[in-house]
A protein has these predicted regions:
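Conserved small/polar residues in nucleotide/adenosyl-binding loops
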Residues: 227-229
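Active-site/ligand-binding-proximal alpha/beta "capping" segment
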Residues: 179-224
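RNA substrate-binding interface of SAM-dependent RNA methyltransferases
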Residues: 98-183
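Alpha-helix capping/helix-boundary segments
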Residues: 32-34, 52-53, 72-73, 93, ...
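Short, hydrophobic beta-strand segments that form beta-sheet elements in well-ordered domains
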Residues: 26-28, 44-50, 160-161, 176-182, ...
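Boundary-proximal intrinsically disordered activation/regulatory segments immediately upstream
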Residues: 1-52, 140
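Glycine/small-residue-rich loop that forms an oxyanion/phosphate-binding "nest" at active or ligand-binding sites
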Residues: 66-88
Length: 229
C-alpha cells in the first residue's frame, strides 16, 4: 500500500519539537536503531521494505505496518540515505527522582544545544553503563530526530530527564558533584565515586555560573572536544 501524502507530511512534521510534544512521539530510522527500540518503546506505526519486513519475526504487536519501496521510503524519510525502515514510537514517561544520583553515577547536561551532541552523549553514557541523564530545560530535545539517530540505540537504555539543575543538585545529600572544566583533574586519573553527578556544559559557554557554584569536584575530560562540548 502506498504511503499517503498526509502520512508523509506527518512524518516530516516530527522535525518540530512542538509537534513531537503534542503527539508524544519520536521518529527513528534504519534497521539497527529501529530493531533496538522495538523491544523498549511502544510503536505507533512502522514502514519498511519487503526485504526488511521479511527478516523480522517480532512485529505482531504493531498494529500499523506498511510495506514500502525504497523510493517511497525516501519520500518519507528525513535522512539523506534512507535505510529499509522508519518507525514512529511513543515517548516514554519517566519519573524524575533526583535521589537516583545518591545511589548511582548520573550525568547532568547544562544547556547542551546541539541535538547530535546530545545523542552522542547518550550513546557514550550507555557504553559506560550510566542509566540516567538530567538535562537543564534549555538543553536540546532528546527526541529531535538528529539526537535519536546519534544515540545509536542508547536511548533504549538511558533515561533522559529535564529539570532545574540547581534545584536538583541542592536536593542531594552528601554526593559528589563533578563538573567538567579545562582546569580540572584528568578524569582518567581520578577515582570516581559510584554515585553522584558528572556535569557537562554548553558547547561554547561551558557550565553556567549558577550550576558551577554547586560543583564540589572539578574534572577535565581529554578529547571531549571531539563531540564539541
Amino acid at each position: 500500500m502506498a504511503i499517503s501524502k498526509n502520512r508523509i507530511k506527518y512524518i516530516h512534521s516530527l522535525e518540530l519539537k512542538k509537534k513531537r510534544k503534542e503527539e508524544n512521539v519520536f521518529l527513528a530510522e534504519g534497521p539497527k536503531l529501529v530493531e533496538d527500540l522495538l523491544g523498549h518503546f511502544d510503536c505507533r506505526f512502522l514502514m519498511g521494505t519487503r526485504e526488511w519486513l521479511a527478516s523480522q519475526k517480532n512485529l505482531t504487536d504493531i498494529q500499523d505496518i506498511t510495506e514500502v519501496t525504497e523510493e517511497e521510503l525516501a519520500r518519507a524519510s528525513l535522512q539523506k540515505t534512507p535505510q529499509q525502515v522508519l518507525a514512529v514510537f511513543e515517548q516514554p514517561q519517566y519519573m524524575t527522582d533526583p535521589k537516583i544520583a545518591e545511589h548511582s553515577l548520573c550525568l547532568a547536561l547544562d544547556d547542551v544545544q546541539d541535538p547530535g551532541n546530545l545523542g552522542t552523549i547518550v550513546r557514550l553514557a550507555d557504553w559506560f553503563g550510566i542509566e540516567d541523564i538530567f538535562c537543564s530545560p534549555n538543553t536540546a530535545d532528546i527526541y529531535n530526530p538528529k539526537a535519536i539517530q546519534a544515540t545509536m540505540g542508547g536511548i533504549a537504555r538511558v533515561r533522559v530527564h529535564y529539570t532545574d539543575l540547581p534545584e536538583l543538585i541542592r536536593s542531594l545529600n552528601g554526593v559528589p558533584v563533578y563538573g567538567t572544566f579545562l582546569d580540572g583533574k584528568n578524569i582518567y586519573e581520578q577515582p570516581l565515586s559510584e554515585h553522584g553527578l558528572i556535569i557537562m556544559g554548553n558547547e561554547g559557554k561551558g557550565i553556567g555560573r549558577d550550576v558551577e557554584q554547586l560543583v564540589n569536584r572539578k574534572l577535565y575530560i581529554p578529547n571531549l572536544s571531539l563531540i564539541h562540548i
